[in-house]
A protein has these predicted regions:
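Short secondary-structure boundary segments
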Residues: 9, 70-71
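Short hydrophobic/aromatic-enriched beta-strand-loop microsegments
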Residues: 28-29, 131-141
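A conserved helix-loop-strand patch within extracytoplasmic ligand-binding domains
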Residues: 70, 79-132
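Hydrophobic residues within well-ordered alpha-helices
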Residues: 58-59, 109, 146-149
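N-terminal hydrophobic or amphipathic helices and topogenic motifs
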Residues: 1-62, 78-84, 99-100, 128
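Short, hydrophobic alpha-helical packing/hinge segments within bilobed ligand-binding/sensory domains
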Residues: 54-55, 143-145
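Conserved small/polar residues in nucleotide/adenosyl-binding loops
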Residues: 151-153
Length: 153
């Protein structure tokens, strides 16, 4: 029986995850351009996925465990649990406002259009703050959305 670990195929977590696996003495052969790699010294397979696919792969049993940022875990809200926080690759989600605006507090976002790659997390946060805003999902280059007049923030 093999333990299948889902990890990020590229991006911020990739290097730290590969170091973590190496420090755990899990030896992987031919990692580049492979989606599934078996360890040469342990009954372990490593499945390389997009970070936003990892929570679902664990929840559905495609992978036994996954290494993913907590932001993706919370956003996807899949039926999986955090077993251990590994302590690397911290993430901070922020709300941005125009430079020429003096920030009066979270109520500034009331009635505004906000672009995000994390609509679930943002929606939950805004509800806890009693702020009603229009959320627009953008999966990449969120920072350019205000300049294109797609959204306010």
């Amino acid at each position: 029986m093999l333990l299948r670990i889902a990890v990020q195929a590229k991006g911020r977590l990739y290097d730290e995850t590969m170091s973590f696996l190496g420090e755990s003495d899990i030896k992987l052969n031919a990692v580049k351009r492979s989606l599934l790699v078996q360890s040469s010294n342990f009954p372990v397979e490593v499945l390389f996925l997009r970070d936003d696919d990892i929570p679902q792969s664990v929840a559905t049993g495609v992978a036994d465990i996954g290494i993913v940022g907590e932001n993706e875990y919370v956003e996807k809200n899949e039926n999986a649990e955090i077993v251990k926080r590994l302590g690397f690759s911290k993430c901070r989600l922020s709300l941005a406002i125009p430079k020429d605006v003096e920030y009066p507090g979270v109520q500034w976002f009331e009635g505004r259009k906000i672009a995000t790659s994390y609509p679930g997390i943002l929606s939950t946060f805004l509800k806890t703050q009693n702020v009603n805003a229009e959320i627009h999902v953008i999966t990449g280059s969120v920072e350019v959305a205000p300049g294109l007049s797609l959204i306010h923030i």
